[in-house]
Amino acid sequence: VEWDERLKGFKINIPHGELFYSKHFFNKKNSDKSIEYFLENNSNNWQTTDWKNLTVEEFKSICFKNIKWKHDSINLYGKNSLLPRITSWYGDPGKSYSYSGINSNPNEWNKELIDIKERIEEVANVKFNSVLMNWYRDGEDYLNWHTDDEKELGVNPIIGSVNFGATRDFVLRKNDKSLKITIPLNHGTLLIMKGELQHYWQHSVPKRKKVKDMRINLTFRVINN
């Protein structure tokens, strides 16, 4: 582990991978503004609405001003199930993305996302062309074990992940389950994954039933298609 004074974060070398971690990469004021921007809509108070209890139809009827949120279903064992989170995909024209049988065509960038992207690019030293947004409505929403190894991401992808809202654990484990690393991601935290990490490690955001607040995570990527 090595502190980088210029980038204000830790460079962390792990077997077959590299991480960069900056706990307060975005300050509280900017992070608060971002989450409000992402959830601003013309009908519901984003802070007091019980988002978990809305039906799919009720959710679809809400007109979000800045982000085109969607609640996808996936087919598991022949049965359709709603994803345990809300998502949105933004990117350059033609930068579509497929995962878990879900195909996403890119929404057009807006100023807020571009501003966040450019800040992270300064640290990651790469030009991102897309971002997956995951909205965890509370601690019951989660992300299963997986690896970001889709062919359109390239051989050794660099992925920049920024967290707004509730603190949630980001957990890495080696494919052979011999080693596990838990990293709490706070309001405004940046985590960058690079090197061979996606070949040797899986990651997840497990359920945390005590967490009642929402969290919005943005993972910036480079799509090669």
For the regions a protein language model found, what residue spans apply to each?
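Non-heme Fe(II) oxygenase metal-center motifs and adjacent flexible, charged/small-residue loops
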Residues: V1-N225
